[in-house]
């Protein structure tokens, strides 16, 4: 990735041009630039799959830009029919981070897993952008939330988010801690954006009639579920690809956004934005997200000033 001046994108039929106020960095951005995502825009392209932007008539909206003109830019185009009003209680960076991660969390926990008040929810990567959204949504639903993280700094973040129990997978036995905390029952719902070893551990500590919601493979390994194990333990494995709802049931996406806006207005959810970076730092932000070293959300803000160059740099 490199920063270049290019012409402003021209809206196609049914599209509008938006001025980008903030663009959230998502794991799909890392996959896009590696050529590993299910969508492969023609080169050259600009990544950035969700933004908070401003319409030409001054409305503040949330949108998914039309690739190849992604959100790490000053202007994008997006389908007019899919624009959502940005909540007034959130700033631009927070609004940009409310969409995909929180919609995924809401559909995963409520539509797919049918999370109930009083149930125990286990969230992997609880200090990350996707995981922190699931933690907040789980608490808002009245669940007891167990957050799994990697490292002390991320453990502190998960505690601040309100997790009832935080497990540092680098220093603790995840399965044993879950069994101990739940008096041997296990977690009713597991929210897994990681895959690999996280999924393997989930299958060992999911409750009778529990539900494992698979939302991604940020760990880099796609697990192979043992269906005989699911059979003898009576648990469900649920897949979630939020983009299908946007394509097949846009009314459900709008209803979810209305609910998320209400939760934000009541202070029950608020995207955890850890950094706001200028366009010049977008490539570094994507790399750090891919490396798994971040907490919360990194958001690209085109109007943010670039960091001063070190002595001799850029000359």
Please describe what each predicted stretch is.
Residues 7-24, 32-70:
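Glycine-rich beta-strand-centered segment in the early N-terminal region that forms part
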Residues 60, 120, 144, 210-211, ...:
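Short glycine-centered segments of the SAM/dcSAM-binding site in methyltransferase folds
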Residues 149, 197-268, 301-315:
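Glycine-rich phosphate-binding loop and adjacent beta-alpha segment
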Residues 173-184:
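Short amphipathic alpha-helix with an adjacent loop that forms part of the alpha/beta core around
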Residues 289-296:
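Glycine/proline-rich active-site loop of Rossmann-fold NAD(P)-dependent oxidoreductases
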Residues 49, 61-127:
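NAD(P)H dinucleotide-binding glycine-rich loop of Rossmann-like/cofactor-binding domains
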Residues 98-172:
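Mid-domain Rossmann-like dinucleotide-binding core that forms the NAD(H)/NADP(H) cofactor-binding site
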Residues 125-126, 194, 217:
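NAD(P)H cofactor-binding loop motif with strongest signal on the N-terminal glycine-rich segment
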């Amino acid at each position: 990735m490199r920063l270049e001046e290019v012409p402003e994108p021209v809206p196609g039929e049914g599209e509008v041009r938006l001025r980008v106020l903030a663009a959230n960095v998502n794991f799909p951005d890392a996959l896009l630039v590696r050529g590993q995502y299910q969508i492969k825009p023609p080169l050259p392209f600009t990544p950035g799959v969700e933004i908070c932007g401003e319409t030409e008539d001054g409305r503040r909206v949330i949108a998914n830009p039309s690739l190849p003109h992604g959100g790490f830019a000053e202007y994008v185009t997006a389908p007019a029919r899919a624009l959502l009003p940005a909540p007034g209680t959130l700033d631009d960076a927070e609004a940009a981070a409310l969409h995909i991660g929180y919609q995924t969390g809401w559909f995963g926990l409520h539509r797919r897993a049918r999370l109930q008040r009083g149930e125990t929810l286990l969230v992997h990567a609880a200090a990350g952008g996707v995981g922190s959204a699931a933690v907040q949504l789980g608490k808002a639903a009245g669940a007891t939330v167990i957050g799994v993280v990697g490292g002390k700094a991320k453990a502190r973040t998960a505690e601040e988010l309100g997790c009832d129990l935080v497990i540092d997978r680098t220093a603790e036995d995840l399965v044993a801690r879950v069994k101990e905390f739940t008096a041997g029952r296990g977690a009713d719902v597991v929210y897994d954006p990681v895959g690999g070893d996280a999924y393997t551990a989930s299958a060992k500590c999911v409750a009778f009639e529990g539900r494992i919601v698979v939302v991604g493979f940020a760990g880099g390994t796609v697990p192979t579920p043992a269906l005989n194990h699911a059979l003898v333990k009576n648990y469900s494995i649920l897949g979630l690809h939020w983009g299908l709802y946007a394509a097949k049931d846009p009314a459900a996406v709008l209803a979810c956004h209305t609910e998320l806006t209400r939760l934000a207005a009541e202070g029950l959810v608020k995207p955890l934005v850890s950094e706001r970076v200028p366009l010049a730092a977008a490539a570094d932000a994507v790399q750090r997200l891919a490396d798994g070293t971040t907490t919360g959300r990194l958001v690209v803000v085109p109007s943010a000033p670039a960091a001063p160059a070190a002595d001799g740099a850029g000359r």
